[in-house]
């Protein structure tokens, strides 16, 4: 796989890099990081993705990763807002995977190197953001914005 024809997202579990999700020719592929596999007490992402050094191909890993995304109308609205196909699991994970429900997150880079900042809002700014929600579900594509998606399935 070359960088030119493969896209990758880091897969993080409880803040530690557990593996890499790749996309090549429309097919997903997940591989655990060697460091994660050697970690005492390492936890698999799922029973369907046991701790193995071999990569998991599309059929084995897609159900787990697609299951991290919102479903139904919310998914359609996020896809439309981000101008991504509703069926593009990888594309949606690349945009909102940093805010998956649960302990797993997906990032194109290392979130530890990102500079986290808090932007305190005035009441009128908060009202404006809330007004955006019907057109911009979960404020998708808002630069640097991170939310908790717990329960947003």
Predicted segments with their positions:
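Phosphate/dinucleotide-binding and metal-coordinating scaffold of catalytic cores
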Residues: 1-153
